[in-house]
Amino acid sequence: MTERFQQKNISVPDGIWIMRQTWNDVLFAHWPVDVSILRALVPSVLELDTYNGQAWISMLPFMLTNLRARYLPVIPGARAFPELNLRTYVTYKGKPGIYFFSLDADHRLAVLGARTFFHLPYFYADMKSEKNGDAIDYVSKRKNDKEAAFHAAYRPISAPFTAEKDSLDYWLTERYRLYTTYRNKLYYEDIHHHPWLLQNAEAEISVNTVTDAHGITLPESDPLLHYAKKQDVLFWPLRKWS
């Protein structure tokens, strides 16, 4: 176990990981949202997690690479494709995690597999991520849903840092479990990675109707922004909560 893991006391989930992938040029765009708005959109079995009483949502555009199952090579055609996640923060029986409203990806097989085997709300979208120096131009338009579109230009503007435990930065980024529901049953999946090496970021989000498509109205204030250059992630099997 590496020094960075030891310093942050991040434990490895039980069992054997089944999938790995790499996230590149990740933008975290965070907005405070009224608890009452999110409560109506999140399954009642989950408790909304708040930081000093405030609920948050986050959008994460990034480029996904090296998607593969354990012991197998990279999935054909999945060497690199964009993904865009919309999420909020929840707990279940004291265990913090995230809940996804949507995950857009520009890879039909990945979308089908995630919907079928992980019961996650993936959508197929036309997407493009272009990098020029340290600046990224990112465009997404969901297929068959013209209202779910996103366009942002972003770049890092600080030296890398790891978030201090108990800080808002840490609370928003260091999450190692996702929750989802299927046929009125609660499921969870654990992930594992190094602590995020973050940078402050600037972004111009010129189009964002993804939140509108899910009934979430964003505040007029600017989002809190972070950037991460790269993160290797391991995934454990989806489990039903007994």
From Swiss-Prot:
Disulphide bonds in the chain: none
InterPro entries noted in UniProt: ADC_dom_sf (IPR023375), DUF2071 (IPR018644)
Coiled-coil parts of chain: none
Pfam families: DUF2071
SUPFAM superfamilies: Acetoacetate decarboxylase-like
UniProt signal peptide: none
UniProt protein name: Uncharacterized protein YqjF
Organism name: Bacillus subtilis (strain 168)
